[in-house]
């Protein structure tokens, strides 16, 4: 008997919607990253994208514990000398509410082409409305 290996063309992908209101950033991100990889499925294969599509709504209402709202820093660099920019969690949520969740989940996915394909299945929206009603996403609670 041989080991089962999932084939990319036979993978069944479902759509799920997650409400991030009041959820802790890291705990939400670990569950979402695991589902994007497909680790919750019995046919999980590390080198095949077996994960589901995840739609996250109310991203602006995600929270962090302790003093991280003011202390947690996010950095980016333009590539030019002296081109480093930084902002804290509060500033990033005010400017781009989807960014903290996207950054947290992206850091938990594999680096490389497979991880980029997994990340493309994540859809994050600041408010409660999303344009994926046609896919009939199921509610997912953590």
Curated annotation (Swiss-Prot):
GO terms for biological process: negative regulation of translation; translation. It comes from the Bacteria. Keywords: Ribonucleoprotein, Ribosomal protein. Pfam families: Ribosomal_L13 (PF00572). Disulfide bonds: none annotated. GO terms for molecular function: mRNA binding; structural constituent of ribosome. InterPro entries: Ribosomal_uL13, Ribosomal_uL13_bac-type, Ribosomal_uL13_CS, Ribosomal_uL13_sf. One of its GO terms (cellular component) is cytosolic large ribosomal subunit. Coiled coil: none annotated. This protein is one of the early assembly proteins of the 50S ribosomal subunit, although it is not seen to bind rRNA by itself. It is important during the early stages of 50S assembly. NCBIfam families: rplM_bact. Belongs to the universal ribosomal protein uL13 family. Part of the 50S ribosomal subunit. PANTHER family: LARGE RIBOSOMAL SUBUNIT PROTEIN UL13M (PTHR11545:SF2), RIBOSOMAL PROTEIN L13 (PTHR11545). This is Large ribosomal subunit protein uL13. It comes from Pseudomonas fluorescens (strain SBW25).
